[in-house]
Amino acid sequence: MPVLLPSTDRDQDSRVGAPEWHQAAKATSRKAHLLTDRCGKEAVTMWQPKDSVLDPNVAHHLGRAAYMEPWRFRVEMLKGGGTVEKPPPGEGVTLWKGKMKPPAWYARLPLPMHRDARAQQTAEVVHAHARGARLTAARLGRAQHQINGQLRLLLRQREATDRRLSEVRKGLLINEQSVKLRGYRPKCEKIPDKADSMLVWEREELKSMKRKMEKDMERSEALLKALASCRDTLDFYCQERLQAVGLMNQPLDKVLEQAGRHSWVDITRPPTPRTQGLKTPPPDPVGAYTPACAKALFEAKRLLMESKDILAELAKNEVDIQNQQQEISDRVCNSLAQKMRETLELKERMTMTLGLMRGTIHRCMKFNQEMYVTRGLIKGPLLKRDLEAREKLNRPLVRMYQRHVGTQLPEATRLAQGTDLLTRHNLQMEKNLKELRTTHDNLAWSLNCKKIGHDVDYDVVRLRLRQLHPHVCYEQAKRLINDWDPRTPPPCSRTNTSSK
């Protein structure tokens, strides 16, 4: 048992030893004490808790008491009113007799198996890099898969847009055919009307739709090139990462499930609740997830979102233009049908007028012939001997009456006046008949023009309905655009070619 020596702190005058001797002894003792503390601390520096550094400004025993306070058991109240002591949570060795649980100590060097530990750490680093490469390859592969899906959707939408653009171009050809076919009407039927205005309006609208569809095709082509370039970049980085994990048997989808998501581009999808998702590793120039991979994934995400918006806009434009083109075509056909109905009404009215005029001409001709017969009867016979006795002016009764002055008979004068009046009436009838025939011919020609105009409008409507059918392609509609008049026979070269 140690014996406590009496204190050597006495009055300076009562000391026997020299002051230098006392100071030398105290210095030696202090040096030994510091060496003891340092050696004691250094003895456990290779094996101690991580947070075992005490505050130098606090007394050693107070710092140690504060440091050991969290080790003690905690008293908890039970529902029945009793108490129970439980060790604190966390790692450590539970000392049930001392009611304490000190934290686990960690060695700075894994002695005595330092070589094995370093080899294991190296293997862990290599496996961590392989896992990172596999996870990055899985994310790159899934991003490439989604970009491929978006490429397929974009190609399908481009085909639909191209078909709609072909329909718009075919509509322009049909409009040109309609204008050209309506140009074969007679001159009197070429007076500008609302149908011509509708055809001009249709042409302008179709040109506007064509420009819009061509812009959509240019946008989709640029997006297609960007998606293809992004896919190639993702494929290059994915194949580069797969070189490090080529011999691993864990599928890439399983790696994504371990990461807590089924996609690395579409981050809007909630993670799978059954697995604990791994955090996105920060880009490391010398690691598996390089800044180039991060940039490629960010570009894929941006292109995916942009392509979704562009695809929706392209589909909307395609449907709108289809409806607009159908509406414009219906309005043009309705205007042509209205013009046909108006032409048919005029044809019926002109046919009735032509029939009435024909009857009038027949009656006038009959009356004119009767007037000529009457004029011949009024003139009398050509020979004097054919005159009747009552028509002779030299008969005895007339000669006896005309013997006195002023008793001349007006028979001859009145006969001459009546004959002249009948002659003038016949001439007027001839003039009226000539005018009636001229008007009849003009009316018949106008009726024929109306019939041709009606037939041309009917052919235009029929042509439009036939050419606008979806089964008629652009090349078939283009064959009808020729430079020769369809009312004339085609050139011999074309005839010979067709016969062959």
Curated annotation (Swiss-Prot):
Superkingdom of this protein's organism: Eukaryota
Residue stretches in coiled coil: 198-229, 422-448
Cellular compartments annotated: Cytoplasm, Cytoskeleton, Flagellum axoneme
Main location as per UniProt: cytoplasm
One Pfam family it belongs to: Tektin
Modification Phosphotyrosine occurs at: 372
GO terms (BP aspect): flagellated sperm motility
Start and end residues of each stretch annotated as Disordered: 1-25, 265-286
Recorded GO CC terms: axonemal B tubule inner sheath; sperm flagellum
Keywords linked to the UniProt accession: Cell projection, Cilium, Coiled coil, Cytoplasm, Cytoskeleton, Flagellum, Phosphoprotein
Modified positions (Phosphoserine) in chain numbering: 14
Subunit text: Microtubule inner protein component of sperm flagellar doublet microtubules.
Function of the molecule: Microtubule inner protein (MIP) part of the dynein-decorated doublet microtubules (DMTs) in sperm flagellar axoneme, which is required for motile flagellum beating. Forms an extensive interaction network cross-linking the lumen of axonemal doublet microtubules.
Name of this protein: Tektin-like protein 1
Organism: Rattus norvegicus
Gene field: Tektl1
